[in-house]
């Protein structure tokens, strides 16, 4: 991409740093995950969790949610100003699962947010360590992406449920910063913008006054983030039109939906990072590993190696398949919910099946579920190979616009063809090419029509043996060319509800 010089790497976004060299980036990312690990160990001590209980992913998620809630200033302020019955704005908590007499018990815990903040800062050399908090948010977002479908949210904003592969990061909180913006898919950004425009249509004062000025700045910033994800001049020019609109309304919504559809073939660049549950970092820190000294990267071999020798457990409901639960968490750990299943299966070294065939529900257990029948099992999070995470979207032809698939946003930089149903996609583009964006629309449609499903993306890129940490010998897999690999095929997952 032409603007490479001004872009910060993900790790810089992740750690809020200015431009750093590779060693400094590795050290600051290492400091970030090390802090998460130290915090987790301290929380396990506070809660008197056994080693086994501390490795339970459900306990990890509760602890992660507590610290995110403790630092959610906006919500904390809101809760103090709007006291609701039975909710203490100064406390946070959740379910902690303990092993008692061969059974799992649920215990609801409550902590002062102030106390949680103190423990977090203490684990992070006295700093607020926002980067670590964002990292946890992205892990939760990746888990949601693998677990839930967003059909309802898509339909509500007038988008097509088949555009689900554009929805990465759709459950990330607003406060997730630059690192959060980097991992949001095109559809997620479009949805946020459409919601904003709809509010403006329904509420006359939305764009007015002092508040309206701030709203406008946020609107233009979101437009610029989305523009930066597109890789063709015509798509970017259309984003300029949307951004500069005096009074955003239905025309802009139309343009945005058009752009979202076009991203199914002319894919945007969306970052992928392997963000692991806090307990995984905790295990490593506890075993004496010094993340800051050794350095760490979210997009290289490090997360694979970490998962290779961490044992994490999960609660399993009576009719769930532990192997399927493992697949769900593996996909979340590598941000691979929207990756081609052929590629994921090859890297994992075990068949990764579409979500419609999974016998498992989400990882979190609802408060009304019966604990009597709960069992636990080891999550199999190891992989056969490792591969570099991408942020390019996998367009061929010098990484410009070309073939995509109606259901993939590549995670791994691995050579493959991107099969897609051109007929399905192009059917959505009949008719409307008039209006002020007509020439751009025509240009975008032309590029899409010229895209060939047999083109190879990530030419020459391969996977690596886990012993090959310097990535010297790429193994380029060969895939069955016509077998399209969408995770969301025949989907029957639950909807995401906050």
UniProtKB/Swiss-Prot annotation:
Annotated consequence of substituting residue 375 to E: In strain: SC35M mouse-adapted
Keyword Endoplasmic reticulum (UniProt): no
GO molecular function, one term: RNA binding
Listed GO CC annotations: helical viral capsid; host cell; host cell nucleus; ribonucleoprotein complex; viral nucleocapsid
Post-translational modification: Late in virus-infected cells, may be cleaved from a 56-kDa protein to a 53-kDa protein by a cellular caspase. This cleavage might be a marker for the onset of apoptosis in infected cells or have a specific function in virus host interaction.
Compartmental location: Virion; Host nucleus
Ranges spanned by the short sequence motif Bipartite nuclear localization signal, renumbered to the chain: 198-216
Motif (Unconventional nuclear localization signal): 1-18
UniProt keyword list: Capsid protein, Helical capsid protein, Host nucleus, Host-virus interaction, Ribonucleoprotein, RNA-binding, Viral nucleoprotein, Viral penetration into host nucleus, Virion, Virus entry into host cell
Disordered: annotated segments: 1-21
Pfam families from the UniProt entry: Flu_NP (PF00506)
Family: Belongs to the influenza viruses nucleoprotein family.
Described function: Encapsidates the negative strand viral RNA, protecting it from nucleases. The encapsidated genomic RNA is termed the ribonucleoprotein (RNP) and serves as template for transcription and replication. The RNP needs to be localized in the host nucleus to start an infectious cycle, but is too large to diffuse through the nuclear pore complex. NP comprises at least 2 nuclear localization signals that are responsible for the active RNP import into the nucleus through cellular importin alpha/beta pathway.
Protein name: Nucleoprotein
Organism: Influenza A virus (strain A/Seal/Massachusetts/1/1980 H7N7)
